[in-house]
Amino acid sequence: MTKDLNTLVSELPEIYQTIFGHPEWDGDAARDCNQRLDLITEQYDNLSRALGRPLNVLDLGCAQGFFSLSLASKGATIVGIDFQQENINVCRALAEENPDFAAEFRVGRIEEVIAALEEGEFDLAIGLSVFHHIVHLHGIDEVKRLLSRLADVTQAVILELAVKEEPLYWGVSQPDDPRELIEQCAFYRLIGEFDTHLSPVPRPMYLVSNHRVLINDFNQPFQHWQNQPYAGAGLAHKRSRRYFFGEDYVCKFFYYDMPHGILTAEESQRNKHELHNEIKFLTQPPAGFDAPAVLAHGENAQSGWLVMEKLPGRLLSDMLAAGEEIDREKILGSLLRSLAALEKQGFWHDDVRPWNVMVDARQHARLIDFGSIVTTPQDCSWPTNLVQSFFVFVNELFAENKSWNGFWRSAPVHPFNLPQPWSNWLYAVWQEPVERWNFALLLALFEKKAKLPSAEQQRGATEQWIIAQETVLLELQSRGRNESAGSEALRGQIHTLEQQMAQLQSAQDAFVEKAQQPVEVSHELTWLGENMEQLAALLQTAQAHAQADVQPELPPETAELLQRLEAANREIHHLSNENQQLRQEIEKIHRSRSWRMTKGYRYLGLQIHLLRQYGFVQRCKHFIKRVLRFVFSFMRKHPQVKHTAVNGLHKLGLYQPAYRLYRRMNPLPHSQYQADAQILSQTELQVMHPELLPPEVYEIYLKLTKNK
């Protein structure tokens, strides 16, 4: 079997992974797999413990099967997929060496395997440094679809994703941020970053799921999730916050950094600050405040999370939107008691809104969004006075007019439109000096509101003027927001077109340069041809939207946007025609007989150019490196020749210089997770070659072994 395995390994295009159970090939592996294995094993153990059994694992792009067989040794049932027969041959030979393992290996294409998967067939899927090839072949959208399906039919997916910055042929096909491939999935979390043998650019590793919250100390299924804090929140926080709801828990997952750089530094800091604030408050709640228990929390460079006990009930905002009957007396009473208790301890909630109040079956209200609990008595928005803001909240609770859509709040500040005795209560507060306003006063007057004098009978001209003015202001705000919606939509479409224009201009510049010094048709030209119809459709949509939404008398800003839209249309057609002509010219050149006849001349010219650019010495070094790479590759494929050469170098005393040269040309990968493994590798090297020990230790070693 050893001879057969040697032959199979020598036939590999590349020894990419560590060969399971055969340390003699560790030095030949392109990547050290042990650091990634530690993380993968940790996630396997967490999921296995949560499900209460060994897992069924799918390894996509299994290469030489190191990760598959390592998990099989823990009791997992493995199916490994790779499109190269040579890799599968090695995997099967290694599986035969370990007959107790439940491991099966097949030749196949990842796209076809994912399409044929059934839900529940596998618990865990692994895809390490493989999907960038599919992106290059089929595009970003297709890979997003594949990964969505993979997350749908498994409990968890572990992905190592290549990045655009890597200097390789497929780099230009990759998304600007690898998270673009998985952002459509419910849950994803960065768990590590690793260098590769191809470049010093690290590749991120993500844990992905459409079914579970996967945190090291918390692994539970969720019933549903949303990227809005409440219904109707729109683009609040730019969808950088995700909320997962389990049977008895709620998980808040805040991203500090998002694809496309959509979060500003201030927005990122706000996410981080509010999460830290909520964790701090809930782990040390003030005495007498009924806070949910914290189940787990943590963060990394990209995100932070908090898992807490799920409170019973529904959001007050949802109940109001549905027109349900609510007991305002109980809701306001319980809410005021909570706010007064917080105030007594030196805390205030700066965002008391219907969507931050949970109401249970007994109509008892409880505050949520504990990240908004602060030590400064000031609201997070207009009006900044907390008592005034609470006036607006009470008006929202009684509001019959749902049509207002204000810039900040959509209900009045004054209490004069409220029914009795609620108007009497807030008017009594209104009459107090502002410096006396607090929640203790609100609660005290609330409890005796039935005995307070009528607000309507005390109303004067000033109050009547306030009612009239605030009604007009709210109406104007609503109209302003509605009328600006069309312009906002146009502005977004103009921005998209300008981005497409910039890409077209870059493509044109590249084509002009390539027409002067012809080479093969680039991917930009292909991209242009494939996307012209999409650009034209987008432009027509923008024009239709403009005609439908903009009134005959256009505001100057909207008219300017339409002019820019028309200019963009003309520029796109102009660039399209020029690029089509360039493409035809390049194709004519490549089909010509002279192009084929001058292939050797062009190669010779390239070598002369490189010689002039780098000099004779550098070109000689380059030639020597190519020869040495061929020799090293030949020896890796022929272990017996390698063994003979190593013995000969030892006898001649040249092994260490040769080994250093080999390592210089084939460096081991390094990453922030490799420190322990590097120390271990150095120790093993010293055991094998005592002359590498420190001089004092080596002298003691010689004394101990000289009589043996």
From Swiss-Prot:
Residues 211-459 are annotated as: Kinase. Residues 485-594 form a coiled coil. Regulates the length of the LPS O-antigen polysaccharide chain. Stops the polymerization of the chain by phosphorylating and then methylating the phosphate on the terminal sugar. This terminal modification is essential for export of the O-antigen across the inner membrane. WbdD is also required for correct localization of the WbdA mannosyltransferase. Signal peptide: none annotated. It catalyses: 3-O-phospho-alpha-D-Man-(1->2)-alpha-D-Man-(1->2)-[alpha-D-Man-(1->3)-alpha-D-Man-(1->3)-alpha-D-Man-(1->2)-alpha-D-Man-(1->2)](n)-alpha-D-Man-(1->3)-alpha-D-Man-(1->3)-alpha-D-Man-(1->3)-alpha-D-GlcNAc-di-trans,octa-cis-undecaprenyl diphosphate + S-adenosyl-L-methionine = 3-O-methylphospho-alpha-D-Man-(1->2)-alpha-D-Man-(1->2)-[alpha-D-Man-(1->3)-alpha-D-Man-(1->3)-alpha-D-Man-(1->2)-alpha-D-Man-(1->2)](n)-alpha-D-Man-(1->3)-alpha-D-Man-(1->3)-alpha-D-Man-(1->3)-alpha-D-GlcNAc-di-trans,octa-cis-undecaprenyl diphosphate + S-adenosyl-L-homocysteine; alpha-D-Man-(1->2)-alpha-D-Man-(1->2)-[alpha-D-Man-(1->3)-alpha-D-Man-(1->3)-alpha-D-Man-(1->2)-alpha-D-Man-(1->2)](n)-alpha-D-Man-(1->3)-alpha-D-Man-(1->3)-alpha-D-Man-(1->3)-alpha-D-GlcNAc-di-trans,octa-cis-undecaprenyl diphosphate + ATP = 3-O-phospho-alpha-D-Man-(1->2)-alpha-D-Man-(1->2)-[alpha-D-Man-(1->3)-alpha-D-Man-(1->3)-alpha-D-Man-(1->2)-alpha-D-Man-(1->2)](n)-alpha-D-Man-(1->3)-alpha-D-Man-(1->3)-alpha-D-Man-(1->3)-alpha-D-GlcNAc-di-trans,octa-cis-undecaprenyl diphosphate + ADP + H(+). Pfam families: Methyltransf_31, Pkinase. SMART domains: S_TKc. This is O-antigen chain terminator bifunctional methyltransferase/kinase WbdD. It is a peripheral membrane protein.
